[in-house]
From Swiss-Prot:
Region (Disordered): 1-85, 207-233, 256-290, 305-384
PANTHER family linked to this entry: TESTIS-EXPRESSED PROTEIN 44
Pfam families given in the database record: DUF4678
Regions of compositional bias (Polar residues) in chain numbering: 11-26, 222-233, 257-280
Compartments, as annotated in UniProt: Cytoplasm
Native organism taxonomy: Eukaryota, Metazoa, Chordata, Craniata, Vertebrata
Biased composition (Pro residues): 365-381
Protein name (database record): Testis-expressed protein 44
Keyword terms: Cytoplasm, Phosphoprotein
Acidic residues compositional bias, start-end: 1-10
Species, as recorded: Mus musculus (Mouse)
A cellular component annotation (GO) from this entry: cytoplasm
Gene: Tex44
Keyword Membrane: no
């Protein structure tokens, strides 16, 4: 705006420069014409000019020269002033343009730097936010994957432990049940066979003791009062029933072999009984024979002999009376047959009971043993003497098998008792329960093992089957768990790959968007900066 008005002074100055040159030429011509030396003298004045007017002409000529000199001086001064003014104005314009260009460049640089700083900050913030979001997504995905994998592993381990525990519990229960059944069946069968073998001897002893229990003063007590004898029998028919257990041909053959071996053995007591029966031809076969007191005393133990001597009734009471055991024995047989008819499922027991058997059936404990007697034997009373007379001592040889072993030796010592006969079948049953289990002992005899350790170490077919089933089930379960774990890891790997791929795609798209956005803004701000 300041440059346009300055052009007119330059044009005027140029015109003025041109004008003084022309004017100077004119003035020079005039001066040269007016100079006195060069000008014409008075003689050269025109002829028509009067002499009086010469002074006036000279004066005018001087005035013209003076005015011209003044005009020249004025023009020179004006030209110098204009040149100075033009120089100053040009200097001011250059300085102003330089300052304006410097300020403009500074402003452009500052604006460009600010724009670049904002763009870089936006880029950094966007990249940081993108990286943060991607890191959060990756962390969340990894945590979720780890949590799901841990839960799957925990559930699989819990299910594995539960199934294994159930399998082990079921196997242990089955093994324990089978072992218990295998042990209980031989014990019940052995108890039954022992009871069947011992019961005839007990019935014979009780029948004989019933004959001997009769007092000499009352010869026909069994015939006159049969109800008193039957009152000693147990009223509950289920007491005498014996559980035969599960039938097994192996145990039946063992029982038959035992009975055969017993029947082959002949004891001294049997030979003495046969000789006494032959010596008394009037006594019918199958009935007990009364042994004289001397013979009985010779066969009884020492403490029984002393008690017999002390409790022997006087001979005056028994000299005129003969005992009649035959009617009493016949009545006892009739009562036994009647009891069998009433209880066909049970084995008949002899109606004649000893004092110990009646005490055992009624639940009354027997008399305590006398501490003064040797071996803890019961007190010597007439009842004990009569029971001793009525019982036949059991010979251990009858129960001795063909082949000796530890189990049968212990049974022989139990049956023999070292001093006298067994008291009842309860002793055998209690021994079979409290000892090392009758089933194990019979199993040892049947299998031919030398000791229980051999039988325990020998693994039966049922145990082997259960073990093989457990092994196969465990292998199948482990293979299933491994395959399930492999598939789970495979799916987790695929999930991680997909998450990583999506993350990289998101990063690329974000970078493309930022690059496109920033380049467009730079393209818009470029022309304005220039």
């Amino acid at each position: 705006m300041t440059a346009e008005p300055l052009e007119d002074p330059e044009a005027s100055s140029s015109s003025t420069h041109d004008l003084p040159e022309a004017s100077s030429d004119n003035t020079a011509d005039e001066n040269s014409a007016d100079l006195p030396g060069e000008s014409e003298g008075p003689d050269s004045l025109p002829d028509d000019v009067p002499p009086g007017d010469i002074d006036e002409v000279l004066a005018e000529h001087d005035v013209d020269q003076t005015s011209e000199a003044k005009a020249i001086t004025t023009e020179q001064n004006e030209e110098q002033d204009f040149i100075r003014t033009d120089t100053f104005m040009r200097q001011d314009e250059d300085l102003l343009s330089k300052q304006i260009s410097t300020i403009t460049e500074k402003n452009v640089d500052q604006a460009y730097m600010q724009i670049n700083t904002v763009f870089e900050q936006d880029k950094d913030q966007a990249s940081i936010q993108t990286a943060t979001l991607m890191g959060q997504d990756e962390d969340q995905a990894f945590l979720q994957i780890v949590t799901s994998v841990g839960q799957n592993k925990d559930q699989a381990s819990i299910q594995t432990a539960t199934l294994m525990g159930q399998d082990e519990d079921q196997a242990s229960l089955q093994i324990a049940t089978s072992v218990g059944q295998n042990k209980d069946q031989p014990s019940m069968q052995m108890d039954t066979s022992i009871g069947q073998d011992v019961e005839p001897a007990i019935s014979t002893d009780t029948a004989t003791s019933a004959v001997k229990d009769e007092s000499p003063d009352i010869p026909h007590q069994g015939q006159d009062n049969p109800e008193e004898t039957t009152s000693l029998l147990p009223q509950d028919p289920g007491i005498l029933q014996v559980f035969v257990g599960f039938q097994n041909p192996v145990w039946d053959r063992l029982a038959e072999n035992n009975r055969t071996s017993r029947s082959r053995t002949v004891s001294p007591s049997d030979s003495q009984t046969q000789e006494k029966t032959l010596g008394n031809p009037n006594v019918p076969e199958g009935q007990p024979v009364l042994v004289p007191n001397a013979d009985v005393l010779s066969n009884l133990p020492e403490h029984v002999q002393t008690s017999v001597g002390a409790a022997d009734p006087p001979p005056s009471d028994t000299s005129g009376r003969d005992p009649e055991p035959t009617p009493t024995t016949n009545s006892a047989k009739q009562e036994a047959e009647g009891f069998k008819a009433l209880n066909p499922g049970s084995k008949a027991r002899s109606p004649g009971l000893t004092s110990e058997d009646s005490a055992a059936d009624s639940g009354i404990p027997p008399d305590p043993p006398d501490p003064g007697s040797p071996g803890g034997s019961p007190p010597h009373s007439p009842d004990f003497y009569q029971v001793a007379l009525g019982r036949n001592l059991l010979d251990p040889n009858l129960y001795r098998p063909d082949v000796e072993n530890d189990y049968m030796r212990s049974m022989t010592s139990l049956l023999g008792c070292g001093e006298g006969s067994i008291s009842s079948l309860t002793d055998i049953l209690v021994w079979s329960d409290t000892a090392t289990r009758m089933g194990v002992a019979v199993g040892i005899l049947a299998s031919g093992c030398s000791s229980p350790a051999d039988r325990l170490q020998d693994e039966g077919p049922r145990l082997r089957t259960v073990a093989s089933l457990l092994r196969s089930a465990r292998s199948a379960f482990s293979s299933g768990v491994m395959s399930g774990t492999g598939s789970a890891l495979h799916s987790v790997t695929h999930l991680l790959e997909s998450v990583e791929r999506r993350t990289m795609e998101g990063i690329r798209s974000a970078m493309r968007y930022l690059a496109h956005h920033l380049t467009s803004r730079w393209a818009r701000t470029g022309p304005s900066g220039n």
